[in-house]
Swiss-Prot record:
Listed name of the protein: Petrobactin import system permease protein YclO
Entry's localization field: Cell membrane
GO MF entries: transmembrane transporter activity
Gene behind the chain: yclO
Regions crossing the membrane: 7-27, 40-60, 76-96, 100-120, 128-148, 172-192, 223-243, 262-282, 288-308
Length: 315
């Protein structure tokens, strides 16, 4: 099957999943349909942002088992949210305004990515693996600081923080939908012209430089893009650890191509199918007895172990 046909198949499955979610057991159209449309839009945006950012990140790191969470961006997001509550309280209407909070989170995550990038290329012989090591250290630091502040704040305000700690597709922040959509659209348009570079970047730094790619500049720009996309997805539903790893590697296995124009589209549609279809199953089959994030992390964790064992055998 050609890759165009495979992408068309994924698009068809995504449309079927969205149609089922929107129209199955609808009941009162006027009340239910607008809410389901908002929910589906947020899920699609989240799935697209996670898949897009993970594919870009794996390309610039040239590693199939890494996700942007290794940079500590998820931990930084939680530190920002905890710090805001700790310093200003949950009653501060300006800081707790969802749009202002979202913009602050995005800007701080971009700033952190730039600082990491400067550390990465400050000395000779530093490479992407040094960046990942620093990211792990900072991620641990941010998690520890968040836990420390959570121990000190008022229990009622801790409840506000706790709502942001876990991914929830039943309590999606739809107020940010238009802002997130505009950011995602602009980011996608900006990144699309780099897709021809991604095919070369996936060969590694030395090959990319030899073939005329301004490696440092492109990596710096893509790290900013990853920070933006991660902040969009995290602000909408909360942190999800393994979704990107799962859908990107499934896209690679399904499409079996090096062309990122196909891989990005495939991973985005697989992510949409997984999230919308998974949420439909959680609501209609499991009747909310479990959550989609638990299923994703469980399946993603098993697949991560499989990838490690598979790569170990290839070594």
């Amino acid at each position: 099957m050609r890759n165009q046909m495979k992408i068309a198949l994924l698009v068809g499955l995504a449309i079927v999943c969205i149609g089922l979610f929107l129209f199955y057991d609808l009941g009162n159209w006027d009340y239910t349909l607008p809410r389901r449309i908002k929910k589906v839009a947020a899920i699609v945006l989240t799935g697209g942002a996670i898949a897009f950012s993970t594919m870009i990140f794996q390309t610039i790191t040239n590693n199939r088992i890494l996700t942007p969470s290794i940079l500590g961006l998820d931990s930084l997001y939680m530190l920002i949210q905890t710090g805001i509550i700790f310093l200003f309280g949950s009653a501060n209407m300006v800081i707790m305004n969802k749009n202002i909070n979202f913009i602050i989170s995005v800007l701080l995550m971009i700033l952190f990515s730039l600082v990491l990038y400067q550390i990465m290329f400050k000395g000779e012989g530093r490479n992407i693996f040094f960046l990942l090591l620093i990211g792990i250290v900072f991620g641990t630091l941010f998690s520890s600081l968040s836990s420390f502040m959570q121990m000190l704040i008022d229990p009622n305000e801790f409840q506000v923080v706790q709502d942001k700690m876990f991914a929830s597709f039943n309590n999606i922040n739809t107020d940010l939908l238009w802002l997130a959509f505009i950011i995602f659209l602009l980011t996608g348009v900006y990144v699309w012209r780099f897709t021809k570079f991604f095919d070369v970047l996936s060969l590694g730094r030395e090959h990319a430089v030899n073939l005329g790619i301004d490696y440092d500049k492109v990596v710096k720009q893509m790290l900013i893009v990853v920070a933006i996309l991660v902040s969009v997805s995290t602000a909408l539903v909360g942190p999800i650890m393994f979704l990107g790893l799962l859908v990107v590697n499934l896209a690679r296995e399904f499409l079996k191509t090096y062309k990122h124009s196909y891989l990005i589209a495939g991973s985005v549609f697989i992510s949409i199918i997984a999230l919308v279809g998974g949420q439909f199953v959680v609501e209609k089959v499991f009747t909310f007895s479990t959550t989609l994030s638990v299923i994703i992390n469980f399946a993603g964790g098993i697949y991560f172990i499989y990838l490690l064992l598979k790569e170990n055998k290839s070594w």
